[in-house]
């Protein structure tokens, strides 16, 4: 496990990780899980969990998830950046989505989405205020949102 985040006083969110020779520390595999401090009530937040036989699939998240923030005024909620994997050969569109996730229940609400790979910066209320993407020449493009729900400038 790596990337440990406290979502509230009694619950942590962790990323499944892998350790390889000659690497200084484990690296995230893009799957997120939560647990209370007693290691009970564990939840899969983001991962690809296929079904088998009669069992339905638990989660079918085809992509890479990272915790990018904690929502200060809503204990137990984290902000997760999810970059979807391409759907087919030649598909270079990597959709970026940001979710507000309840670490206890696993419920999620999409709060941002862009059809290109992007990173976001958030204010104290968990609202995306800065968005960084790249143009056709791989130059960074920084966009600003003056207030909640307003257009990107």
Where are these regions (language model features)?
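Beta-propeller folds
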Residues: 1-153
């Amino acid at each position: 496990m790596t990337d440990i985040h406290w979502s509230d006083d009694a619950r942590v969110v962790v990323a499944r990780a892998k350790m390889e020779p000659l690497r200084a520390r484990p690296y995230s595999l893009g799957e997120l899980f939560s647990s209370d401090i007693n290691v009970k009530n564990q939840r899969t937040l983001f991962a690809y969990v296929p079904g088998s036989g009669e069992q339905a699939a638990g989660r079918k998240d085809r992509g890479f998830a990272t915790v990018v923030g904690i929502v200060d005024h809503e204990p137990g909620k984290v902000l997760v950046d999810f970059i979807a994997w391409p759907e087919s050969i030649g598909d270079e569109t990597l959709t970026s989505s940001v979710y507000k996730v309840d670490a206890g229940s696993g419920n999620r609400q999409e709060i941002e989405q862009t059809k290109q790979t992007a990173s976001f910066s958030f204010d104290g209320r968990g609202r995306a205020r800065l968005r960084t993407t790249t143009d056709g020449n791989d130059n960074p493009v920084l966009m600003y949102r003056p207030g909640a729900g307003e257009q990107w400038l």
